[in-house]
Design a protein with these regions (language model features):
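Non-catalytic alpha/beta scaffold blocks inside enzyme catalytic domains
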Residues: 1-191
Length: 192
């Protein structure tokens, strides 16, 4: 895998990744256990070991087993960011709607931020799934209201974090500061 690793790190870090610094291998997070799958993450949330969660195009309350355990884990977070075109069970887990979601909203301290995204038909891009097919599609229409593409939201987040690290420093800013971002439109890179 050495050639793949070098190619990957050069694509992420450009000229900053060199043989002298081991292609910035130390910038990659290291696991203390063999696998952090989604069930393990929710277990860690339940234990209060995870402070925040970015949920992008995924509805864990509807997708994972034991809805009450998942909701309990989300309630222990300090913050939850949900990026989805629709309001989902996850983005509304804190909201009491009687028998459909009978929770004590006042006891849930998680700050929930919902960032409305466009759906697949409102952006250019590719689709891939477990059936092993890959399909390119072109944008069919603009997204509604303030909805933004996932690419724009994540790019804005990266650029703002990078700017803040440049101004204020931080514990280990290098992975963000040295990342290569050679796009013509930095805040909304084209998937082409």
């Amino acid at each position: 895998y050495s050639k793949f690793h070098v190619s990957l790190m050069k694509s992420w870090y450009g000229a900053n990744a060199t043989v002298e610094n081991n292609w910035l291998y130390d910038h990659l997070p290291k696991l203390d256990i063999p696998n952090y799958d989604v069930l393990k993450m929710f277990d860690l949330m339940s234990q209060g070991k995870v402070n925040g969660y970015m949920c992008q195009g995924f509805n864990p309350i509807a997708a994972l087993p034991d809805k009450n355990r998942v909701m309990g884990a989300l309630a222990k977070l300090k913050w939850l960011v949900v990026m989805d075109p629709l309001a989902t069970e996850t983005s509304e887990f804190w909201h009491n709607v009687g028998p459909y979601n009978d929770v004590k909203s006042a006891e849930i301290q998680t700050e929930v931020i919902r960032l409305p995204t466009t759906c697949f038909a409102e952006e250019d891009g590719s689709l891939v799934n477990s059936s092993r097919w890959l399909q390119w599609h072109w944008k069919g229409a603009d997204g509604p209201g303030e909805a933004q593409t996932d690419i724009r939201i994540m790019s804005e987040l990266f650029l703002r974090l990078r700017k803040r690290y440049q101004a204020e420093g931080g514990k280990f800013p290098d992975p963000l500061l040295k990342l290569s971002w050679p796009y013509k439109i930095p805040d909304e890179p084209s998937p082409e």
